[in-house]
């Protein structure tokens, strides 16, 4: 579980594609208990559309330890610690402006796992959440990750070894936060080449049967 209470803003670069002209990415890291409306607004204002890339990292017993949201030019990385559960104002901000903001689509991998962790760990719901890959055995495979990124930017050559490194299972640590942030950025880039998907995860639905809407 993350115990840092600091926040930081840095600049990182993607290395998935052999293309030096892709602009640098601003990475803001903040503990949930220190989340501000400005941090959220800076992310949302950097969007050119309605789709966000999302990445999550889990600790022991699948407890959520880090959550990242990405546009093309900015990543907001939120870490959890022992005070996260009681950070009511900040949790409400996260819920209202990002997680349950129906004007924003949230795209990532294994989104049903994130939905469960948000509810069990923080008592939060998520709406307009979509899984980038939903076809059975391909989920979570390196071939699937590479395929999504390759289709997203056909004009650029994909560095497959970087994809394998970034998406390898590894514990989240602050000293490697840029690598985790790039997962969210990759989800943002990947979804830009995918048409609208019919299946949406909505854990705020009162009817349990309607929580996965087809």
Model-derived features with residue positions:
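Conserved DEDDh/DEDDy metal-dependent 3′-5′ exonuclease domain
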Residues: 51-52, 57-190
